[in-house]
From Swiss-Prot:
Pfam families: Methyltransf_9
The protein's enzyme class: transferase
A molecular-function term among this protein's GO annotations: transferase activity, transferring alkyl or aryl (other than methyl) groups
BP terms from Gene Ontology: tRNA wobble uridine modification
Annotated InterPro entries: CmoB, Mo5U34_MeTrfas-like, SAM-dependent_MTases_sf
HAMAP family noted in UniProt: tRNA_carboxymethyltr_CmoB
Subunit relationships: Homotetramer.
Residues the record lists as binding carboxy-S-adenosyl-L-methionine: K25, W39, K44, G63, V114, E115, Y135, R250
Lineage: Bacteria, Pseudomonadati, Campylobacterota, Epsilonproteobacteria, Campylobacterales
Keywords: Transferase, tRNA processing
EC number(s) per entry: 2.5.1.-
Name recorded for this polypeptide: tRNA U34 carboxymethyltransferase
Family: Belongs to the class I-like SAM-binding methyltransferase superfamily. CmoB family.
């Protein structure tokens, strides 16, 4: 949890926090008020925080949401940090949080998507984190290509995506929704994902971890509006989504840009 012990008016603070719902990423604690977000993002961060050194590196978080991971990255001594997310509400959440967790104003927040990287940030970063974005993109290869071109030669990508458990080079393409998500388009096997990454130029593909999503990591709280994981799974068989697909399984990966070709 990210904690700030500034002494503030708790009633006013809580009103501000609740006006910014839903809080997807967190948790945070400000002046003893805990923002109990839908996702316990510390679980994911613990998996990827030591994937590569951030010390004195130029680092990006693509799909950064409200900045939770950016605030955690500050603890690892990067040279600079840039977050990218086109969402309006999550930027407002970041602007609310930054005075508490980025008091030296080291983080740059850009309201841009991954598709903007090619033109505006070629060969710009030593490390890119792209967590929970790929399966939301209609063209995963173009997304990986944009991430590739935004890295310097020798740069590293840390990627998290939904995956399917299969030895084949295949991807699940949900008919309408996956776990009630309308914007889940391609959910690859690890083998298929590795092939995609190699096709755009990445090498040294490494599996960091594979983890099932559980109610410990994602659940309903008072700080979100609406449903969460328990509502997305089959009531009688939690190994399946409501649509009958396998329940969410996430893979965490690291890979290297070894050349500027492609």
């Amino acid at each position: 949890m990210l904690i700030c012990n500034d002494n503030l008016n708790q009633k006013t603070l809580l009103e501000e926090i609740m006006a910014l719902r839903p809080w997807r990423k967190g948790p945070f604690e400000i002046s003893k008020i805990k923002i109990d977000s839908e996702w316990d993002s510390s679980i994911k961060w613990d998996l990827v925080k030591n994937a590569t050194s951030l010390k004195d590196k130029i680092v990006a978080d693509v799909g950064c949401n409200n900045g939770y991971y950016l605030f955690k990255m500050l603890e690892h001594g990067p040279k600079s940090l840039v977050g990218f997310d086109p969402g309006v509400l999550v930027k407002k959440q970041f602007e609310f949080l930054a005075p508490f967790f980025d008091k030296e104003k080291k983080i740059i927040y850009k309201s841009l998507g991954v598709e903007d990287l090619n033109e505006k940030y070629p060969n710009a970063f030593d490390v890119i984190f792209c967590l929970g974005v790929l399966y939301h993109r209609k063209s995963p290869l173009e997304t990986l290509k944009a991430l590739y071109h935004a890295l310097k030669i020798g740069g590293e990508l840390v990627l998290d995506t939904l995956i399917i458990d299969s030895p084949l080079d295949i991807a699940l393409c949900p008919k309408k929704t996956y776990a009630k998500m309308k914007n889940a388009y391609f959910i690859p096997s690890i083998s298929a994902l590795k092939g995609w990454c190699e096709r755009v130029g990445f090498g040294d593909f490494e599996i960091i971890s594979v983890l099932k999503t559980t109610p410990k990591e994602q659940r309903k709280t008072d700080f979100i509006l609406g449903q969460s994981l328990e509502d997305f799974l089959d009531k009688k068989d939690h190994s399946k989504t409501l649509e009958g697909y396998d329940a969410p399984l996430r893979g965490y990966f690291k890979m290297l840009k070894s050349s500027s070709k492609r």
